Each structure stands twice: as structure tokens, then as C-alpha cells.
């Protein structure tokens, strides 16, 4: 699963695409961990833009749980942004929104971690 990223001040927006399931969870976890490492080194928060994710399985939720634990042990912050309706429902039903903050838009997520990052996002 490809992970693109873009930095906005003290935040890095990471944008996966496709399905987060058993078939690609291992690679996603490895790549997301590398992104978390970079955020830790930069002192940046990680915003996981889920707008390109069509589906999340239980294996995908496990990957997100591991990422949340990694962020906590590294004194980093990770938030979820812009999930599609089906993914938002999965996160809510599984109560995963209690593990990681979930925001309706990428801008809202950026504003929650850094007002300066939200301003940089607004400037494009």
C-alpha cells in the first residue's frame, strides 16, 4: 500500500490508499512505523489521512493499535483524519475513536495538533 506524506510545520500528513486488511497490513505497519520514526525525530505529530482508505478489517485495526502504542512510547502524537463514511463507522463501532482521535477533515486534525500546521495547510 503506497503511503504518501506531506509536512505542514510541526505535523506530517500521511495518506495511505486502498484497503487496510490482512493482505497489506504488514507493509502498512512497517511504512507507518518509519513515518512515526521520522515524526519523532522532527518533533512532529502524525496525521493519518484516511480519505483514501476504502475499508479497514480487524487486521487493519490491529495495525492502527500498534501505531498508537508506538506513538505513545515515543512521546509522539497520532490522529486520524477524514475517514470515508464506511471507515468512520468501523472506527466508531469498534470504539477505536477512543484509542486515536478521529477528525472529519485533515484541516481539523491539523488544527488539533498545531494551529501553525493548520495555517500552513490553508496556504497550500
Could you tell me what each predicted segment is?
Residues 1-15:
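Short beta-strand/loop segment at the start of cytosolic alpha/beta domains
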Residues 6, 81, 103:
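General small-molecule cofactor/ligand-binding pocket signal
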Residues 9-10, 43, 66, 80, ...:
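Residue-level detector of intrinsically disordered, flexible termini
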Residues 13-15, 48, 121:
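Short, flexible active-site loops
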Residues 22-100:
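Amphipathic alpha-helical interaction surfaces in cytosolic regulatory modules
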Residues 101-124:
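A charged, well-structured terminal subsegment
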Residues 2-3, 45, 86, 114:
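Short leucine-rich amphipathic alpha-helices used at interfaces
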Amino acid at each position: 500500500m503506497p503511503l504518501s506524506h506531506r509536512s505542514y510545520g510541526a505535523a506530517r500528513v500521511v495518506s495511505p490508499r486502498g484497503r487496510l486488511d490482512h493482505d497489506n497490513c504488514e507493509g502498512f505497519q512497517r511504512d507507518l512505523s518509519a513515518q512515526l520514526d521520522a515524526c519523532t525525530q522532527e518533533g512532529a505529530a502524525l496525521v493519518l489521512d484516511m480519505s483514501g482508505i476504502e475499508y479497514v478489517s480487524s487486521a487493519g485495526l490491529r495495525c492502527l493499535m500498534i501505531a498508537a502504542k508506538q506513538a505513545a512510547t515515543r512521546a509522539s502524537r497520532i490522529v486520524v483524519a477524514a475517514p470515508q463514511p464506511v471507515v468512520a463507522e468501523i472506527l466508531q463501532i469498534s470504539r477505536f475513536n477512543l484509542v486515536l482521535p478521529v477528525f472529519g477533515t485533515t484541516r481539523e486534525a491539523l488544527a488539533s495538533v498545531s494551529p501553525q500546521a493548520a495555517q500552513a495547510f490553508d496556504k497550500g
